[in-house]
Amino acid sequence: MGGYVNIKTFTHPAGEGKEVKGMEVSVPFEIYSNEHRIADAHYQTFPSEKAAYTTVVTDAADWRTKNAAMFTPTPVSG
């Protein structure tokens, strides 16, 4: 699949006397999807004000576990 993922971040505080500078970057979709393990995953994201699904992850450790599970192969039931 061609095209680009375009990401814009904004400068924001990062602790006492520090900040993360905003930046703009365009990444070829293939590189982005491979690095984020979404290649061939029929992956979709969309912003919303409220959670769209009943499973809601609220901390980073839980997200790492859930994210890994999203891409863990299991036997095909038939």
Swiss-Prot record:
Question: Could you tell me which species this protein originates from?
Answer: Escherichia phage RB69 (Bacteriophage RB69)
Location in the cell reads:
Virion
Function of the protein:
Capsid decoration protein which helps to stabilize the capsid against extremes of pH and temperature. Once maturation and expansion of the capsid has occured, trimers of soc attach the interfaces between the hexamer of the major capsid protein. Acts as a 'glue' between neighboring hexameric capsomers. Dispensable for the head morphogenesis and phage infection.
Q: What is this protein called?
A: Small outer capsid protein
Family statement = Belongs to the Tevenvirinae Soc family.
Per the record, its GO cellular-component terms are:
viral capsid, decoration
Q: How does it assemble?
A: Homotrimer. Interacts with the major capsid protein; three soc molecules associate with each interface between the major capsid protein facets.
Keywords for the protein's UniProt record, in alphabetical order: Capsid decoration protein, Capsid protein, Virion
